[in-house]
Amino acid sequence: MQIFLKTEDEINLMRKANQLVGLTLAELGKHIKPGVTTLQLDRIAEEFIRDHGAVPTFKNFPNPFGEPFPANICTSINDVVVHGIPSEDDVLREGDIISIDCGTLLDGFNGDSCYTFCVGEVHPEVKQLLSVTKQSLYLGIENAVAGNHVGDIGFSIQSYCESHGYGVVRELVGHGIGKAMHEDPPVPNLGRRGNGVMLKDGMCIAIEPMITMGNRKIGLLPDKWGIATVDHQPAAHFEHTIVVRKGKAEILSSFQEVEHLEGQNI
């Protein structure tokens, strides 16, 4: 395992890439409504990212079968946990939730973040799933400080979500990030305190709880990309890229613009 600690100059570049991801998610949030297709969202994202001098990282990213991802963002609706492929056939409907995972490459460094949006009015139980998942992300971030371990992050996420009766996906994890989208160490959403890689100042990692309303079991869709819950219950996914610091982690990505937009729509 090779972990790259980032310099302050490198962290500044990563901050810019991640801020662009936040702006892209907010731009997409303006268009999330019934009748919109996920392919439309993908085109909006690509244009926005490229207009800001960056490249969509996910385009042509290979899966374990060596097949390139055919789109610019991942659009995962309802029971699809991750890696949903945008399509003109996927039309958003009132009451859906959609997780949009977005990555950018800017000045040689990557940004990565995900947000689960509501499409119109969503059932209160589903809203609760989103709320708990987002809160678990911040609990994980609170534990991402120098001297702690990767297991401290996973433990805080797992214990909080399972206390609410939700399933924590085991097979999908967070990751280190920098010049490459996926670097060491893996960052699972479960674990035991004091276990795993020790966190050091300057480590940049993406923390991303993927939480299910029902059974935690998942399966690969026929397109070899999308991964969905086997019981077809909804799943939520929130992700921030952070840098490990002494005392308190620094969040490099941002939900501020998205949440401001959501506040205007209440």
Residue locations for each model-derived region?
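Active-site neighborhoods and metal-handling regions in enzymes and metal-associated proteins
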Residues: 1-266
